[in-house]
């Protein structure tokens, strides 16, 4: 009897020793490990998707340089705006470089802006040019190329003039050929050659309208604007001289 009990106990212990080990020691590639790997991949995919959605809802702020570049971008102009001859004027020039001194290469300077024009008006001609026929100019004038940022249109309203024009990925500057009086009184009595005993006189700058490319918001369009184009003499009869 005791031999039978010992046999049963030994058989029971051998059966326990031969039983499978716990899942902690399951070899790689077993169902337990595959489930863990699939769960990890699913979590990673979910995290990436969430990150992309977050980036789309809250995009990263642009750099200051990019914002400045965007704000300074020129308005792109349709080349068709330049195809109509009625918009062309000999006093308006679009160029990538400063224009020549003048159309006849005489007595014209290039200045950066209107302030420079007012500070530094000078001419390459003599103050009182004399030709072979002994002809004199009643008023002395100076002609210059200028850039304008603002002007007055034909309706008397202020408009913004385009300085830089983006045309076919090339940036052109808009220049205006202006003529102004050099001095309101070229001689002490006023205009040169006027009989001061009977007439009051002085020189003044007159304006004309030219077509210029202007902008309103992000739109470019042609408008008539005033620019200085001539220097003339104005006379009036002195009181009592009839």
From Swiss-Prot:
Q: What is its main location?
A: secreted
Q: Which InterPro entries match?
A: Cystine-knot_cytokine (IPR029034), Nerve_growth_factor-like (IPR020408), Nerve_growth_factor-rel (IPR002072), Nerve_growth_factor_bsu (IPR020425), Nerve_growth_factor_CS (IPR019846), Venom_nerve_growth_factor (IPR020433)
Sorted alphabetically, the Gene Ontology BP terms of this entry are: cell surface receptor protein tyrosine kinase signaling pathway; modulation of chemical synaptic transmission; negative regulation of neuron apoptotic process; nerve development; nerve growth factor signaling pathway; neuron projection morphogenesis
Organism in which the protein naturally occurs: Demansia vestigiata
Signal peptide span: 1-18
One Gene Ontology MF term: toxin activity
User: What Gene3D superfamilies does UniProt report for this protein, alphabetically?
Assistant: Cystine-knot cytokines
User: Mind telling me what this protein is named?
Assistant: Venom nerve growth factor 1
Q: Does the keyword Ribonucleoprotein apply?
A: no
The family assignment reads: Belongs to the NGF-beta family.
The compartments listed are: Secreted
Please indicate if the UniProt record lists Transmembrane as a keyword.
Answer: no
Propeptide residue span(s): 19-125
Q: Where is the composition biased (Polar residues)?
A: 31-43
Give the multimer and partner information: Homodimer; non-covalently linked.
Arranged from A to Z, the UniProt key words for this protein are: Cleavage on pair of basic residues, Disulfide bond, Glycoprotein, Growth factor, Lipid-binding, Metalloenzyme inhibitor, Metalloprotease inhibitor, Protease inhibitor, Secreted, Signal, Toxin
GO cellular component terms, A-Z: axon; dendrite; extracellular space; synaptic vesicle
Organs and tissues of expression: Expressed by the venom gland.
Composition-biased stretches, type Basic and acidic residues, lie in 52-66
Membrane-spanning segments: none
Intrachain disulfide bonds: 139-203, 181-231, 191-233
In this protein, the residues bearing a glycan are 147
What is the protein's known function?
A: Nerve growth factor is important for the development and maintenance of the sympathetic and sensory nervous systems. It stimulates division and differentiation of sympathetic and embryonic sensory neurons as well as basal forebrain cholinergic neurons in the brain. Its relevance in the snake venom is not clear. However, it has been shown to inhibit metalloproteinase-dependent proteolysis of platelet glycoprotein Ib alpha, suggesting a metalloproteinase inhibition to prevent metalloprotease autodigestion and/or protection against prey proteases.
Region Disordered, as annotated, extends over 26-69
């Amino acid at each position: 009897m005791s031999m039978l009990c010992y046999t049963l106990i030994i058989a029971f212990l051998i059966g326990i020793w031969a039983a499978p080990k716990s899942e902690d020691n399951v070899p790689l590639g077993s169902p337990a490990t595959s489930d863990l790997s699939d769960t990890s991949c699913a979590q990673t995919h979910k995290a990436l998707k969430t990150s992309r959605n977050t980036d789309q809802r809250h995009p990263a702020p642009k750099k200051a340089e990019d914002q400045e570049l965007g704000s300074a971008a020129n308005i792109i102009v349709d080349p068709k705006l330049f195809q109509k001859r009625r918009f062309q004027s000999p006093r308006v020039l679009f160029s990538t470089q400063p224009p020549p001194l003048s159309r006849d290469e005489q007595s014209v300077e290039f200045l950066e802006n209107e302030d420079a024009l007012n500070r530094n008006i000078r001419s390459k001609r003599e103050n009182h040019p004399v030709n072979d026929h002994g002809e004199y100019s009643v008023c002395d004038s100076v002609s210059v190329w200028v850039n304008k940022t603002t002007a007055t249109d034909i309706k008397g309203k202020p408009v913004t003039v385009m300085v830089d024009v983006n045309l076919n990925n090339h940036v052109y500057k808009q220049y205006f050929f202006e003529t102004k009086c050099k001095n309101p009184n070229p001689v002490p009595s006023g205009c040169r050659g006027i009989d001061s005993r009977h007439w009051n006189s002085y020189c003044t700058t007159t304006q004309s309208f030219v077509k210029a490319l202007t902008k309103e918001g992000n739109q470019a369009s042609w408008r008539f604007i005033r620019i200085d184009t001539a220097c003339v003499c104005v006379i009036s009869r002195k009181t009592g001289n009839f």
